[in-house]
Amino acid sequence: MAQTVADVMTRNPATIERGESAAEAARLMARGDMGDVIVLDNGTVSGIVTDRDIAIRLVAEEKDPRTPVAEIVSDAELATATPDMPLDQAIQLMRSRSVRRLPVLQQGRAVGVLSLGDLAMERDQGSALADISAAEGNA
């Protein structure tokens, strides 16, 4: 039987409203030992902010940590998956959109995130990325 996104995704993603600060997004990432937070616009999924976004669009540009996440999140159309999407289809979507993470939505609500780390742990358990992704955080 073909695997689905639900079989591999990280469940219960952290969320933040777009007006909240980048510093709060970073705190959520640190608290949850993760590299992303789903961005909401009045409760509706509107984007995903990553540790890389914070490094490149906030720290490197010497912006204030109180900057709203809306100002650092990518403005590209958000690629998403559903829990029942075949895993191979989600991987193809990630390749075609050049994204490392896909928010997983069910009836418009964020239920997970599919990341390269999740895929590495599932598809190539001996890889360095799988080892790193499976390790406990050192924060």
Indicate where each model-derived feature is located.
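C-terminal structural segments of small proteins and small subunits
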Residues: 102, 117, 121-124
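Bateman/CBS regulatory modules and CBS-like beta-alpha motifs in cytosolic regions of diverse proteins
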Residues: 1-28, 34, 39-41, 45-46, ...
